[in-house]
Amino acid sequence: MNAILPKISTLPAKPAPTREWLAGIDLLLAKRYQRTALMSSKHFGPLRVQRPFYPEPDGCCHIYLLHPPGGLVIGDNLHIGASLQQGAQALITTPSAGKLYGAKGASEKQGQQVEFNLAAESCLEWLPQETIIFDGANGTLSTKVNLTGNAQYFGWDIIRLGRVASGEPFNTGTCAQRLQLWRDGLPLFIEKTKFEASSNMHREKWGLQNANTCATLTATLQLTRDSIDEMLEALAQLGVTNTGEWGLTQKESLFIVRYLGNSITDCRKGFEFIWQQTRAVFNGKPAEVPRIWRT
């Protein structure tokens, strides 16, 4: 007897292949003699460090993270990790903006996870370029910093929604952002933000007010009220307060700066100014601007 074959329409559909491009890097830095050495750099995919730089006399290690693709499409995932041993000092930055590209009707996500672990007496400055969220993106961004003892951290996260100047506003899509700072297992700062183009939060005055640039700077330093007032006046004289709103807040052992506006240039300029003005308070030495910012 011949077997009865099922109709083609009743056969289970072959699952569509998922596109996924993973990349990651884990750095280990330790104090060796008179400078901080990059002890190991374990990576997979297109994410790596070319070589460490030492532009400062105290041996602080400057690291440029290179990601040749330049951005993440739907399905991509990027992991950045660094561990600093006792007494290590490092400044980590990126040569260009990160990008989360969009795709119509995408159900998969793309994302970047950053995690730093700092031992006692270590110091990390995380100063990346901005991340651009393209129209139609479906992204997640996470930054977590674990501090031990008297470890110090200075970092910022800058979000650019769409590319208005290029006629590509952020009309559709979403991106969930999470920022965390912990010291000895206790939270210093935890914040969750969801950038959703169609939401009231994106449009209303109590939310983003249709601004296309949103940024947060956090630093484990203590400033006086007078110092903060003087810094606000200096930002105004610098000409960066006309395109957005600035908020400077001193919490217990944590200094927080926020920018909400429409100029990535003014945001970067203001953040760099604050970093240069406070670095001596933060780690006792003048700012040494990474050369890659000027190329």
UniProtKB/Swiss-Prot annotation:
UniProt GO MF annotations: nickel cation binding
Record keywords, A-Z: Chaperone, Cytoplasm, Nickel insertion
Entry-linked Pfam families: UreD
GO cellular component, one term: cytoplasm
Signal sequence segment: none
Localization annotation: Cytoplasm
PANTHER family: UREASE ACCESSORY PROTEIN D
Function summary: Required for maturation of urease via the functional incorporation of the urease nickel metallocenter.
Subunit structure of this chain's protein: UreD, UreF and UreG form a complex that acts as a GTP-hydrolysis-dependent molecular chaperone, activating the urease apoprotein by helping to assemble the nickel containing metallocenter of UreC. The UreE protein probably delivers the nickel.
Sequence similarity: Belongs to the UreD family.
HAMAP family xref list: UreD
Name of the featured protein: Urease accessory protein UreD
Annotated source species: Saccharophagus degradans (strain 2-40 / ATCC 43961 / DSM 17024)
Higher taxonomy: Bacteria, Pseudomonadati, Pseudomonadota, Gammaproteobacteria, Cellvibrionales
The gene coding this protein: ureD
